[in-house]
Curated annotation (Swiss-Prot):
This is Uncharacterized protein AF_1353. Keywords: Signal. Residues 1-28 form the signal peptide.
Amino acid sequence: MHLTIMRRFAVLLLLAIFLGGCSGSNGAAEEKWKMKVIWHVDTSGEPFMDLSPDGELAAAVDWNNAKIYLVKPDGESVVFDIQGQDAVKPVVSGVALKDGVAYVLGSYEDFVGIRKYSWNGEVGEERHGWAGSVSDNILRSPSGNHLCYLITIDAGKQELYCDGVKMTLGGDYYFLNSVSDSGVVVISSGDGTHVFKEGNEVLSFNTSNVVAYKDRVLVNEEDFLRVYDLSGNLVGEKEGYTFSLTTLLRWTLLPTERYIFRYEPLEDTHVITWDIKQVETLPGFPQFANDHFVVTSKNGVLHCYSLKDFHEVFSVEMPEDDGLIKLSDDGRVMLVSGENGGYWLYVSSENNF
């Protein structure tokens, strides 16, 4: 009798241990999925691409051939000629998606600015400057609710357009660093940075390594990572936590709602809280992060981790040694580029379209 009870108890104990090992820290099973390539195109030239946060539309520019591809997560795609009726090919400087429309920033035959494309074709232009003007760069906020682009009209004169509102910049040559969901815009020039909100300058720094997340500003100054609010109050700092812009215009520091992901040179990705305390280390370089997932790359493999408990959600081999990464908010759609062109759209194999 007692032996039978003990055997049953042992079986139940082993089952509990097994189930516990298959579950996350909160007792729920760790959700994982496989990704498959649903669409691919070979292109050449500098890669410019975007993926809507909901994963419903991807945009990819064929730089050398002046084309833009729009792709749905079921693999259906359309392609449009960016050159249009122009006698010369445009010099494209970026693309951003907002409300189902791809904004293609470029230097066109007789103007600099934007050509817009929806699924059904070209839907408009935003013309500025003249034939000798230059397009600089374009960014949208993480949710896509704000969109800004920067152009050089003449030597010593630039124009910054954010949600249709123009700001004229003079003197230095500026670069558009960051646009946040709360409308904070960061531009840099040489070793200086200016931070704007609603057209008003709110902060400035003597460094070009500055990014924004909502109403917080992350600054690399004097070998420190410092976090400020828009009133200029220092809310956190850590010595030695430097960051910068690297190849393909990628920051080595990615802020999200709960965590900051920072690449430690020649090492891995450090996961930091907003009070600048390290809580986790992930392998490789931080390629992309949103408020739910982070994607890192190491030894030719992309790894996606859930921000709930940092378990690995999926991993795929990189199609090329380096490139750009965009991931949907739900982690089920991913757009990848090569370093010199070529695009791959991945979707979760469990998705049904």
